[in-house]
Amino acid sequence: MISKDQLVNEGIRAREVRLIGQNGDQLGIKSRQEALEIAGRANLDLVLVAANAKPPVCRIMDYGKFRFEQQKKEKEARKNQKIINLKEVRLSPTIDEHDFNTKLRNAIKFLEKGDKVKASIRFKGRAITHKEIGQRVLDRFSEACAEVATVETKPKMDGRSMFLMLAPKNEKQ
């Protein structure tokens, strides 16, 4: 509703303003000076709410208290936002069973925390000629994570690496 660089009291340059009282009642069109006097008598501030209106709309309110309330609301909104991190699990085309299970456990732990997981395979030397081996490893990995994750991007090559993106399943599904 009101921006951070809000015009208050003497900062308002319009000659006439439509005045709204502190209870939300319309006080009519007043000169800027008269509106400032009314706000001053109530020990409150005159705040420009709608600058583009004809005439501009001003409201009588305690600006300090209003800013405090706005900051509190913004802080609460930021606190409720879930930050999703991207975790990477590196595999190799010739990964052993125990190593695969360890990487899988870590990936499942990340997914249960709500993070996305990027499973990547780096091909070294001539291993790049056998991309199907890496493809099978990533397919096996995505099938093993199927209970807690959905595949966001299918396995694809990027230079000498092949990667797969997994996102946590929603509770709704």
Curated annotation (Swiss-Prot):
Coiled coil: none annotated. Gene3D superfamilies: Translation initiation factor 3 (IF-3), C-terminal domain (3.30.110.10), Translation initiation factor 3 (IF-3), N-terminal domain (3.10.20.80). GO terms for cellular component: cytosol. It is found in: Cytoplasm. Keywords: Cytoplasm, Initiation factor, Protein biosynthesis. GO terms for biological process: ribosome disassembly. PROSITE patterns: IF3. This is Translation initiation factor IF-3. Its main location: cytoplasm. HAMAP family: IF_3. The keyword Heme does not apply. InterPro entries: T_IF-3_C_sf, T_IF-3_N_sf, Translation_initiation_fac3_CS, Translation_initiation_fac_3, Translation_initiation_fac_3_C, Translation_initiation_fac_3_N. Monomer. IF-3 binds to the 30S ribosomal subunit and shifts the equilibrium between 70S ribosomes and their 50S and 30S subunits in favor of the free subunits, thus enhancing the availability of 30S subunits on which protein synthesis initiation begins. GO terms for molecular function: ribosome binding; translation initiation factor activity. Belongs to the IF-3 family. It comes from the Bacteria. Pfam families: IF3_C (PF00707), IF3_N (PF05198).
